[in-house]
């Protein structure tokens, strides 16, 4: 009799066979083991039965981790252990978190930790979809009040057809990499990058992925039913009705007036004043035992009042917080070339959101090497997003990038990546950094706009300029409003926010987060149409400042050149033990890369360095010409003649009979090592041996 009570579900999902099982591994947690094709992921969920005293937020943590043993590899880091999370692990943790978080009831604050561990991988598929399915299943069999399950799907677009859960190899030829997650009836999350697809094609991919994942949702529901865990009885605490009425009656009008203040900092100050006044008026004596509880209730009621005030104003057709219409983009100010010694720079300002973006061009040695389950990845493009506390007028401790910064940086990267030139055409390593210097919503899309401008300012030949816009949606019953270029407050108080980046011809990145059910395909279609109009408006403004990439690379960037040599000459350029190429690098300061086919790529600090490196390489690889006179240096004297260096690394023999017209008894009477002489190439035999002569050659003659 087995000691394990294993329950499992097995089903076909696209081209992959999926098995979800529980009861065999990690039995002290709510755990499932997901096998999906060649990938296995263990997902464990721990749910605290009680909330911490005074807890006022939902402490949900998702950790996705890839173990190198899963692919039969030993980590390359110090100590040969997995270190801090990679960017892909961090992004996947966020990918799982986003569709799950909205499915817990309002007011639920028990701590939940989800750990997804990749324990086996065929290196042919990403494990994020399997991990998302596992997280949904583990939560569904737990006692947490989770309003799931959810499903997850990756969608590609290859040869005009949608492809479900494409492999890593298939994604290389796909015009789309889209991940969609949702419940039985609603899409909750979309994350994607695309090669200028239309709004209809993107929406079609979302709906296709949601339709295909229904089999996942059904099987997880059956698994949860078979396990039969009793869910926690949770009822969200109701707001004190009497206190709510007082706060609304006494301070509702003041809150509405505060939201008519367009300046963010002034508005926040006024709202804080009103909150303090409400606490003073309604919380009672600060020394009383009931004060702390009443203060917390008033703060919660006040936040609800702000939420309802903004939403009601939008749905009733009133101007937005800053006075704009629903589809109006904030005022734009665009500058390029603002930092004289960077390779490319742009200052993009949209209302109270501002990004200072720089581009740096590097050589092949600057490539970012990433150790992954699929092998070592050479990343030639990096986009880093920084969000300092001062950008929102706050103080705080600066440190390593947080998950949000990594996620926003990846979204901005997705927006511009498809428009980068091929590495064969433009071999530079590119690093873009977006410093958010002011923020009031949509900073990731400001980074997309700034990145496009900074890249073009640096002379990177983009296929087309890219702009991004953040959209929001407020919905109550049948009434809804789509908002273009949302503020921070509109982001927090809305039911859906989505970000769209693209060119004039199509979408390059789409991110969508939906907090409620009832967002139909018609609503999403309208939102995408409105986003398209906003994107074109921003692109037109950008094009007025810099319509295309500069025709030349910035003067401060490394100078680049390519030359071709005969593959037989590669060893001459490299030299014994690499001595020649090391000397070349030391002499010129250039970085020199040589391919097996004889292609040499040279990155010099400036044009002069590149030119000198080319000159020296051409001298090393030059072929001697029969009948041509060369100025050479005597390398070695022997009894039968002298070996003379006529080109770098190329020696020929002056036979004793070819030194002078008269008979020569001793070579050393005429020649010595280091002596410079003029010689004529008589012949080169089929073994490459060079015959030289001094006869009839004027020794004052210079090299031809």
Swiss-Prot record:
Pfam families named in the record: KH_1, PNPase, RNase_PH, RNase_PH_C, S1
Known role: Involved in mRNA degradation. Catalyzes the phosphorolysis of single-stranded polyribonucleotides processively in the 3'- to 5'-direction.
Gene Ontology MF terms in the entry: 3'-5'-RNA exonuclease activity; magnesium ion binding; polyribonucleotide nucleotidyltransferase activity; RNA binding
Binding residue positions for Mg(2+): 491, 497
Domain spans labelled S1 motif: 627-695
EC number: 2.7.7.8
Organism listed in the record: Psychrobacter sp. (strain PRwf-1)
Keyword vocabulary terms for this entry: Cytoplasm, Magnesium, Metal-binding, Nucleotidyltransferase, RNA-binding, Transferase
Example of a GO biological process term: RNA processing
Required cofactor names: Mg(2+)
Protein name: Polyribonucleotide nucleotidyltransferase
Compartments, as annotated in UniProt: Cytoplasm
Matches recorded under InterPro entries: ExoRNase_PH_dom1, ExoRNase_PH_dom2, ExoRNase_PH_dom2_sf, KH_dom, KH_dom_type_1, KH_dom_type_1_sf, NA-bd_OB-fold, PNPase
Reactions mediated catalytically: RNA(n+1) + phosphate = RNA(n) + a ribonucleoside 5'-diphosphate
Subunit-level organization: Component of the RNA degradosome, which is a multiprotein complex involved in RNA processing and mRNA degradation.
Top EC class for this record: transferase
């Amino acid at each position: 009799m087995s000691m394990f009570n294993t329950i499992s579900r097995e089903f076909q999902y696209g081209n992959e066979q999926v098995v979800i099982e529980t009861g065999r591994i990690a039995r002290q947690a709510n755990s499932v083991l997901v096998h999906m094709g060649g990938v296995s992921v263990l997902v464990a969920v721990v749910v605290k039965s009680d909330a911490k005293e005074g807890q006022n937020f939902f402490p949900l943590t998702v950790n996705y981790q890839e173990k190198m043993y899963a692919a039969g590899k030993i980590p390359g880091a110090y100590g040969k252990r997995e270190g801090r999370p990679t960017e892909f692990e961090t992004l996947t943790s966020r990918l799982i978190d986003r569709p799950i978080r909205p499915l817990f009831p309002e007011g639920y604050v028990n701590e939940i930790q989800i750990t997804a561990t990749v324990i086996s991988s065929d290196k042919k598929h990403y494990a994020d979809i399997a991990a998302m399915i596992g997280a949904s299943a583990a939560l569904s069999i737990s006692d947490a009040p989770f309003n799931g399950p959810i499903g997850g799907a990756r969608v590609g677009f290859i040869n005009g057809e949608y492809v479900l859960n494409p492999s890593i190899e298939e994604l290389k030829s796909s015009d789309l990499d889209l991940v969609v997650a949702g419940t039985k009836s609603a899409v909750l999350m979309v994350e994607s990058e695309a090669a200028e697809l239309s709004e209809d094609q993107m929406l079609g991919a979302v709906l296709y992925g949601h339709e295909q994942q229904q089999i996942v949702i059904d099987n997880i529901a059956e698994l949860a039913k078979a396990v039969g865990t009793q869910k926690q009885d949770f009822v969200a605490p109701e707001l004190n009705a009497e206190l709510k009425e007082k706060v609304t009656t006494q301070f509702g009008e003041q809150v509405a007036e505060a939201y008519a203040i367009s300046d963010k900092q002034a508005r926040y100050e006024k709202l804080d004043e009103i909150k303090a006044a409400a606490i003073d008026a309604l919380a009672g004596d600060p020394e009383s035992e009931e004060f702390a509880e009443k203060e917390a209730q008033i703060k919660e009621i006040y936040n609800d009042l702000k939420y309802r005030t903004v939403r009601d104003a939008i749905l009733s057709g009133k101007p937005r917080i800053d006075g704009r219409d629903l589809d109006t983009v904030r005022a734009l100010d665009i500058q390029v070339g603002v930092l004289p010694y960077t390779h490319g720079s742009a200052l993009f300002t949209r209302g109270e959101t501002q990004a200072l973006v720089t581009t740096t061009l590097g050589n092949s040695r600057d490539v970012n090497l990433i150790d992954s389950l699929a092998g070592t990845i050479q990343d030639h493009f990096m986009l880093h997003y920084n969000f300092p506390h001062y950008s929102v007028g706050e103080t705080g401790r600066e440190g390593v990038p947080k998950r949000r910064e990594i996620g926003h940086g990846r979204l901005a990267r997705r927006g511009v990546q498809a428009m980068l030139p091929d590495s064969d055409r433009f071999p530079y390593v590119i690093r873009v950094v977006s410093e958010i210097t002011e923020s009031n919503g949509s900073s990731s899309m400001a980074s997309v706009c700034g990145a496009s401008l900074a890249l073009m300012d640096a002379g990177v030949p983009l296929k087309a300029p890219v702009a991004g816009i953040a959209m929001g949606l407020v919905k109550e019953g049948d009434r809804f409003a789509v908002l273009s270029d949302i503020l921070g407050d509109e982001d927090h108080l809305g039911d859906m926010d989505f970000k769209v980046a693209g060119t004039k011809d199509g979408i390059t990145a789409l991110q969508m987060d939906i907090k409620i059910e009832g967002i139909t395909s018609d609503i999403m279609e309208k939102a995408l149409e409105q986003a398209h109009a906003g994107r074109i408006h921003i692109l037109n403004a950008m094009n007025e400042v810099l319509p295309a990439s500069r025709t030349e690379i910035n003067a401060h960037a490394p100078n680049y050149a390519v030359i071709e040599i005969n593959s037989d000459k590669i060893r001459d350029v490299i030299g014994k033990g690499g001595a020649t190429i090391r000397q070349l690098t030391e002499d010129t300061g250039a970085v020199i890369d040589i391919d097996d086919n004889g292609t040499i790529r040279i990155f010099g600090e400036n044009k002069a360095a590149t030119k000198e490196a080319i000159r020296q390489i051409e001298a090393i690889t030059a072929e001697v010409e029969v009948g041509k006179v060369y100025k050479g240096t005597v390398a070695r004297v022997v009894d039968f003649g002298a070996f003379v260096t006529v080109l770098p690394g190329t020696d020929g023999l002056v036979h004793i009979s070819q030194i002078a017209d008269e008979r020569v008894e001793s070579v050393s009477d005429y020649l010595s090592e280091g002596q410079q002489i003029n010689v004529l190439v008589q012949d080169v035999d089929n073994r490459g041996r060079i015959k030289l002569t001094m006869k009839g050659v004027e020794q004052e003659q210079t090299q031809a």
